[in-house]
Amino acid sequence: MNTKSKTYRLVIRAILTAIIILQTMVPFLGFIPIGITSLTIIHITVIVAAIVLGTKDGMFIGLVWGIFTMIRAFTSPTTPLDIAVFTNPIISVVPRVLVGLVAGLLFTIIYKKTKKVVAASIVAAIFGTITNTVLVLTLMGNLYTGLVANTYGVDASALFVTLGGIAITNGIS
């Protein structure tokens, strides 16, 4: 890799890192609070990083998102679950890193087979989004069943039905 492309990648990575930090820390920019939960659009930035820069950089940008999600949960929680749930790096960091991994790998595999950027990007975006939503909600439900069920006002036995409804709603919006 020549110096120009190393510099280019460094600058793009820095810009995407700054965007992630802004989206995470500025209210309503990346996390949109809706009642006791928040919708996020930040995964789009991670997916773009994975598609444009590759899997490794997508994972790095996802790591930045996860770390700043955890910092935000400690410093300025926006929902009742933030302080209890998103201070756990298994929930705040791991799914975000895996968004970059899944999106980057799928884009690379599909692009190599089809040479179609748009198709590879669409599949990477869909599965990157699903990765974040499913992992965060599943980990929340499994690690904090009682707390999450109580917060959503449902019985623990009905928690995963409720979380499934949230996942579907997030997928549509």
Please describe what each predicted stretch is:
Residues M1-S173:
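Loop-helix junctions at membrane interfaces
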